Amino acid sequence: MIELDAVSVAVPASASTPAASPGAEPASARRRWGRTDHGTPEEITILHPTTLSLTERSVAVIGANGSGKSTLARLLNGLVLPTRGYVRVHGLDTHDDGRAVRRMVGFVFSDAEAQLVMPTPREDVALSVRRTGVERSLRAERVEEVLGSVGLAHLADVSVHALSGGQKQLLALAGVLATEPRVLVFDEPTTLLDLRWRTHVTALLGRLEQQVVHVTHDLDTALLADRVLVVDHGRVVADGTPEASVAAYRELMATRVGTTDEP
């Protein structure tokens, strides 16, 4: 269970580059005048006060570029800490219990290469497996199992640098799955995958027992979730069934680009 209690995220307007702050999305920022808790005369609000209780197994977050959706995702494992309010994951506060939350919440970035630190897929997943405390005699089997689940078993010993962008994203996903987190958060994990692999990964996510939260531009993927949030200019403007939220998102986009097609 994930709870956001009156959570907001802001950066000082005097900062030379707001985007330098983790999760900041200046394209969506709105300036709010008046002193903050820290005495700053003004600040750029990235995410306006948000209260949510996420209990569904699968939650999708959709929105235009710069809407604040990635900031919302990064709040869930403490990559971004709220300026105000509280984020709790299974009862643990991301500020007070940050290390425990990060062990509990696996995160797959859109830039998967940043998560890959070992020379080969086998070694990269093995590193994650070791961190879980799996007995030495069972580690090799677990590595094979995880690589097989994402379709990379046949590439276990090739150089990571030889993998395609899509394969690197699959490897990053494998590394996170190997840690056996209770919650999985994905920030556009299928961006570089072709239709075949996107279908494969989507089916894999549907079989997982963990709670899954994913930021996506793919409305077909969003429709497979149990609940969909629409984020716009740092606010959750729709929250409900996949069909209702996707319809609200299409209508929102239509008012801006004059079409119901995905931008």
Predicted features and spans:
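Helix-to-loop junction immediately C-terminal to a conserved catalytic motif
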Residues: 77
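Catalytic Walker B motif of ABC-type/P-loop ATPase nucleotide-binding domains
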Residues: 184-188
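Conserved ABC ATPase signature
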Residues: 159-163, 167
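Conserved ABC transporter NBD signature motif
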Residues: 85-96, 101
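Conserved ABC ATPase "signature" region
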Residues: 32, 137-155
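The feature captures the beta-strand-to-loop junction immediately N-terminal to the Walker
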Residues: 62-64
